[in-house]
Amino acid sequence: HEDAIYRLGETSKFKVVALDCGIMLSNIQVDYEVSEDLMPAHTKKSITLKGNEGTIVAGTMKQPGYLRVKAVVEHEGSKYTSYSTVGFEPDKLLPKVKMPEDFDAYWTKTLKLLDKVELAPKMDLIADRCTDKVDVYHISFGNIKGTRMYGVLTMPKKEGKYPSILKVPGAGVHAMSGNVAWAAKGAIVLEIGIHGIPVILESGLYSDLSNGVLSNYVLHGIENRDTYFFRRVYLGCVKAVDFLLSLTKSNGKVGVIGGSQGGMLSLATSYLDKRISATGVYFPAFCDQEAYMHGRTGGWPHFFKNKEIC
């Protein structure tokens, strides 16, 4: 199917060609595996390309999900691997994770911690990043337990009232430059970090932290919801909304956007803070972590992919 979408019970087929510098190879063996996305392969077979192409009959699925084919060709002493995935009624996928009974009660109580946190904003102009239309600042503000959130704020120079965009980060430990392009179009944009450190330092420092104390930070404190790494981050995102609304050029409207880890943070911030009026999410991480317990893949960081943990 051109759109790579199948109905449940329908047989999926993959056309296979092998190219060497754009020239089709013939009579070459292709080893392939079929799996339900990131789960272990349930089929391992080989075909030989007759003429210039072949067909892999990958089968079907009885439940909504994704079927993945991994194809391997050995040619002139080297192995080459390619992947292709099709969906089986993916719009009918439902999460396996269940909402904890005390979820809303817990977060209602936890959010009240921010009432005692002074915003104490700091804004330092980054002159060499400013343009004729946009001012750029390195900013910080208070968060729980005496920590601070840091980010880069870009804001139109022209007087007026503007909507704000909170840009939450993907995974990793890295510097930030700010979004001058969006600000030039008439938005206040705050790009925040989540590690409680300035975001305009030398790149080597972030590499050291990523390989050191912040290695595998997604697991830090995971034994208890009150100590988990992202609890402070979620609250910091809500505090970021406070910061944006405190700006004199704010028109009172705030949107949030992010991808991967940032997609998760965008969803979380929108749920926890009803002041958010627009939400942008692309390939969100942390989705349906418990799916592995039910024989189906979950999203990054795949907490339960290891069967020993399950």
Model-derived segments and spans:
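Cap/lid segment of the alpha/beta-hydrolase catalytic domain
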Residues: 174-235, 243, 290-300
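Short beta-strand element of the alpha/beta-hydrolase
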Residues: 151-155, 161-172
